[in-house]
Amino acid sequence: MKKNFLFLLALLCTAVQVGWAQSEMDTVYVSKKDHPDAAYFLPEPPDTNSVAFIDDMIQWEWGKSQRNTPRGEQASRETPWLPEIMRTVMAEVLQIDTISDEKTPALSRLLVKSYHTGNQSTVAPKETYSRKRPIVRLNEDTWGKYDSDFLRTNGSYPSGHTAFGWATALAFAEMWPELQDTILRRGVQFGENRIITGAHWQSDVNAGYLCAAASMAKAHTNPDFLKDVLAARAEYAKLKGLPAGYDPVSKADVPHGEDFLNMPVDTASYRYAADVLQFWDAKRLRDTERGKQAEEEADYSVEMMQKVFGEAMGINISPVSTPAICELIELVLNKASETADRLKPIRFRKRPFVQLGEHTTVPEDEEKEKGKSSFPSGHTNLGWSMALVMAEVAPEQQNEILRRGYQYGYNRLIAGYHWASDIEASRLLASALVARLHADLPFLQLVYRARYEFLLNATGITTVLDDQEPASSPAFLLNGIPATPDSHGIIIQNGQKFLVK
């Protein structure tokens, strides 16, 4: 069974291998020009006159309080901006001596390319915003062991360390799901290190996690990524002396948020004040078009996902026209529900409208929802999970898809059903879930079917019923579907011809 599983995955990799240029892609999974545009799908960094900046300041104080502790020592020694630090971190998590090109070439390749992919995901938004770091804004010295004054001229938003740490963690969690929660915990901590050292604000770190997840969604469209995951998995199994047929995928279900996410904010915490203020700040949007959108999208259903992401993808999603995409949406929704629902009773937190004696934008749901936990946000978990998967299905529309996925989570703050910190944690949970889903062969096959379906339904691609033969130009890849073009824009796929206008 194990051999069949790996063989089928290898076939999928081989089928989509053609067309990727090797020069730039030797060290990354996503070229610079193809990264999702974080300046579009994420909000601008909080200004110093904003309510969100209060949370940044509170967390800066928390970070400084950790410095003279073992947690602070960890943050300091993990400040290098090189793949070597991730080699150390992941070797510790995997309980092996080292990850190196010489001794573990497959693990090393997956690590280095994931590292650089995550790191590159923040370059453009850093240049766009040039946000001042805490050490600059507050006239502080650098504190991390390997941090330097270079940071003073490098943008704070988003956090590059967070992005390359979380990207690497997501890749390794997918590679060995049996250890996913331990791997993910270290990925979360690696981002928080930057708050402790004073190199970044909390909002920078939040954005870094999301940049990483978005770019790893794009990485999944590169056939080399799956090949490298499989090679690293086989190498690690051999390194640990595991028996033939050992399957780390079958030994892990959905990620357990209680093992890698922080505890929800308590009312005794200073950060609770920031949650309350952000609740009031979002409430003012209720009588605006943005508030109307939050109210209209309160429905948690397959139909709502079809509507929201169909609009973002520029197609009509329906069981008739896009059965594979509908099947994929239902699968992701069910897994997102499972992931969030199991965590809610474990990490129970009162919802804002209950805690503050308020009403919501959806009063008809208040009675049934008042006894349920605010942490995590099921809607946010669903929206961001779906966005990451649909961005893989339709990378041409990735920025709009990711933007809508982000907004779907923020809706819940406007509506009064969730706290801001719950929403941020839920996006981490979603990223972890998507990594786990990619370890399953049926999921990968469904994504490829959905991709093909999107191409057939997207504007500008129509069936051509002529007898023109394809030219002898090189074969190329349309995200998982081998295709051969001719000089007139004809694509031959599975015996059918399509005209790309």
Regions found by a protein language model. Name each.
Residues 343, 478-481:
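Short, glycine-anchored, charge-dense loop/turn motifs used at functional sites
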Residues 1-22, 244:
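Bacterial Sec-dependent N-terminal signal peptides
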Residues 213, 431-433:
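Catalytic phosphate/nucleotide-handling subdomain of diverse soluble enzymes
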Residues 490-501:
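C-terminal tail/sorting-segment detector
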Residues 22-197, 218-224, 228, 234-415, ...:
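Hydrophobic alpha-helical bundle signature of multipass membrane enzymes
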Residues 482-489:
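Conserved beta-loop-beta connector loops within the AMP-binding
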Residues 200-205, 416-423:
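Short acidic/histidine-rich active-site segments
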Residues 457-479:
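Residue-level detector of functionally pivotal "anchor" positions at catalytic/ligand-binding pockets or at interdomain
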